[in-house]
Curated annotation (Swiss-Prot):
InterPro entries: AlgH-like. One of its GO terms (cellular component) is cytosol. This is UPF0301 protein Anae109_0457. Belongs to the UPF0301 (AlgH) family.
Amino acid sequence: MPSPAPSGLAPGFLVAAPALGDPNFAGSLVLMAEHHGEGALGFVVNRPGPVTVAEVLASVDEDLRRAAEANGRAGAPVLVGGPVQPERLWILFRPGGIGADAEGAVPVGNGLSLGGSRELLEALVRAPRGDPFLLLLGYAGWAPMQVEREVAAGAWVPLELEGSDLVFDVPLEQRWETAVRRLGLEPGGFLVGGGGASA
């Protein structure tokens, strides 16, 4: 069984406990990208939004939309990364190869990198071999000590980030349940005190 994340929550996952009351995060799996004394930043990686990759790309560049259609990526949902800055586009991808040297790309850890530049977006969308990536709008943010209090209250259960498979290889609708089982639990088998990230 994977061990819980160490005291620093990033890189790692936060698994929402079943009774988490915040509608922004109920049933969510959050990839934690930053966690330090000034707060924390993460991305919900299992909540599809109302727009597709094609719709977002069409607002950037019609040629990119056509490239996504040619690569079979156009119909994929853009995920709701969180309630903070919902208009901001983020790109989550596997480092190495396509996009590895793109401007602004930063490693999250254990097989995942994050960016938001147009250069990175173009490289990934046009890649002929189909390197996996996710587009996310918005992020989840926590003030200093907020996420620690929420974890202590039972709103979230930390899970170690052991690779990118939970993000890219597990179907969207199964990610939360898979994470719960990796904790050695069954869905519905643990309780929550409350809490939620900032909006």
